[in-house]
A protein has these predicted regions:
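Cap/lid segment of the alpha/beta-hydrolase catalytic domain
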Residues: 1-50, 56, 90-100
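Loop/turn elements at helix/coil->beta-strand transitions in domains of secreted/extracellular proteins
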Residues: 3-6, 55-58, 79-83, 124-127, ...
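An acidic- and aromatic-residue-enriched active-site/binding cleft used to recognize and process polar
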Residues: 12-15, 64-67, 77, 86-90, ...
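Alpha-helix capping and helix-loop boundary segments enriched in small/acidic/polar residues
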Residues: 27-38, 61-72, 105-118, 132-139, ...
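Primarily recognizes the serine-hydrolase "nucleophile elbow" in alpha/beta-hydrolase
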Residues: 45-111
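The feature captures the conserved acid-bearing segment of alpha/beta-hydrolase catalytic domains
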Residues: 83, 95-150
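Alpha/beta-hydrolase-fold serine-hydrolase catalytic core, especially in secreted/extracellular enzymes
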Residues: 123, 130-215
Length: 215
C-alpha cells in the first residue's frame, strides 16, 4: 500500500473473526475452498464496480502457500487479474496440504490436472513464481518453470514469466520472498520503489482490523 497500491486482504474461512462464526474446524473442509474463492471474487467485484481509485488495468493477485493456491484459482476464475505472483505453493506433484486450498480436490476433476497447468492458462500476462529449496517447490527451477516458459513461448512472451528461487530458504513468506514480490509488482505496475523499505511500516493491532464481532 505504501508503494501506491490499494491492497485488500480478508480472513480465511474459520480463521480470525470468521472463527467466531463457523469455528476453527470449518477451515479444514472443502467448503472453505469454495467460500474463500467466492470472497475473493466478491471483493474484486466491489473494487471494480464501486471504488473510483482503482486502475482496472493493474489488478494483481498474490499469496503464500495456500494463498498461492488461491492466487492460481483466482486467475482461472477471473480474467480481470492482470499480474500474479503465487508464492511457495506451485508444484506439479502436490496440490496443497489443506482442503481449504484444494477442495475435494478440484485437481481430480475432468481427467485430472495440477496447479502448473492451471496457472499456465494465465499466459501471456505477467507471472512470477517464488519458490525455495526447503519445501515441495524445490523442483520449480528444473520442472515447473521450464514448462511455464514453454507455454508462454507459444505467445512470444517468455519474458513475462519469471521464477525467483531461494534454495537456502524454507516454507514461509519471509522478507526475501516479500521483497521479490514487491519488486515484481513495482516493475509490472510502475509502483513507487522508494517505499519498499518495510522498516517504515506500522503494524496495526489486530483489534483495529476487526469489524466488531464479539470475542
Amino acid at each position: 500500500a505504501r508503494m501506491g497500491a490499494v491492497c485488500v486482504d480478508f480472513d480465511l474461512y474459520g480463521y480470525g473473526e470468521s472463527e467466531q462464526e463457523v469455528g476453527r474446524e470449518a477451515h479444514r473442509t472443502d467448503r472453505a475452498h469454495v467460500y474463500q474463492a467466492a470472497c475473493a471474487l466478491k471483493l474484486l467485484d466491489y473494487l471494480w464496480n464501486h471504488r473510483h481509485d482503482i486502475d482496472r488495468s493493474r489488478i494483481g493477485a498474490n499469496g503464500g502457500s495456500g494463498g498461492g493456491s488461491h492466487t492460481i484459482l483466482l486467475t482461472v476464475l477471473d480474467d480481470r487479474i492482470t499480474a500474479a505472483a503465487p508464492t511457495v505453493n506451485l508444484a506439479s506433484h502436490f496440490d496443497g496440504g489443506c482442503p481449504c486450498e484444494s477442495g475435494r480436490p478440484i485437481h481430480l476433476a475432468g481427467g485430472g490436472t495440477c496447479n502448473p497447468e492451471l496457472i499456465a492458462m494465465f499466459a501471456p500476462r505477467p507471472l512470477q513464481i517464488v519458490s525455495d529449496g526447503g519445501d515441495w517447490t524445490a523442483s520449480v527451477p528444473t520442472l515447473e518453470y521450464p514448462y511455464l516458459r514453454r507455454i508462454y513461448g507459444f505467445y512470444g512472451a517468455q519474458d513475462k514469466v519469471e521464477n525467483v528461487h531461494l534454495p537456502a530458504e524454507r516454507h514461509d513468506y519471509g522478507p526475501n520472498k516479500r521483497q521479490a514480490n514487491y519488486d515484481f509488482f513495482a516493475r509490472v505496475f510502475d509502483l513507487d520503489r522508494t517505499m519498499i523499505d518495510e522498516t517504515k511500516v506500522t503494524i496495526e493491532p489486530s483489534r483495529m482490523m476487526e469489524t466488531g464481532l464479539e470475542r
